[in-house]
Amino acid sequence: MPIDPRSIARAWRHVLTNRMSVGYALALMLLSGALFGFIGSAQQIFVEHFGVGNRFGLCFAAVAGAMGLAGYLNSRIVERVGMRKVSHTAVIIFVAMAVLHLITALAGIETLAVFILLQMLLMGAFALTTSNFNAIAMEPMAVIAGTASSVQGAITQIGGGLIGAIIGQAYDGTTIPYSLGLAVCGSGALAIVAITERGRLFRGYHQPPATG
């Protein structure tokens, strides 16, 4: 089948002009930036700041394990509760934990145990948020799912990678820049979702789907 540039252009236009598609892709971009920031900063924070040495793998695994458990929990509750209720609640928890993280860092009372606990809660909320945000972004794109997935993925991964790099490069020997980065990313994602849904968090603003 020959490639039709006009069909491709129409599909791109649908993806980039649909409120749900763009809004949730941008929110995912910010949250992905937070994840990439964690991955890029984890060794410096755990090894240099907290001095965990060869326990780094265990510390990292604890946080990753929380994400895995949250993913399993999501699979059990999302059909009963709904994507929006799960993800909107989770992103609010993400913001709250990120702000608490920043406060403890600024106050100088953040121990290794506190850091790991807050990271587990943050990344658990991240897992509950992002899988559902991705599904919501794709919801009105069923007819052009392949193109939509490619465009949204590019926005999320490229933008998130750049944000994560900024967070990682901001490391100054403390957890303050990292915690601030997560708080900014989470707050930005929540604001974008609220605007996208016209303030109807947990219920949603329903835009007509793409028609091809």
How does the language model describe each region?
Residues 85-133:
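C-terminal transmembrane helical hairpin of 12-TM major facilitator-type secondary transporters
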Residues 1-25, 212:
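Juxtamembrane intracellular "pre-TM" segments in multi-pass secondary transporters
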Residues 17-37, 120-121:
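Pair of pore-lining "gating" transmembrane helices in MFS-fold secondary transporters
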Residues 135-176, 181-182:
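A late C-terminal transmembrane helix in Major Facilitator Superfamily
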Residues 40-55:
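Short amphipathic helix-loop junctions that connect adjacent transmembrane helices
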Residues 84, 196-212:
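Intrinsic disorder in cytosolic terminal tails and internal cytosolic loops
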Residues 70-85:
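Helix-to-loop junctions at the C-terminal end of transmembrane segments
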Residues 53-61, 150:
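Small-residue hotspots at the loop-to-helix junctions and early N-terminal turns
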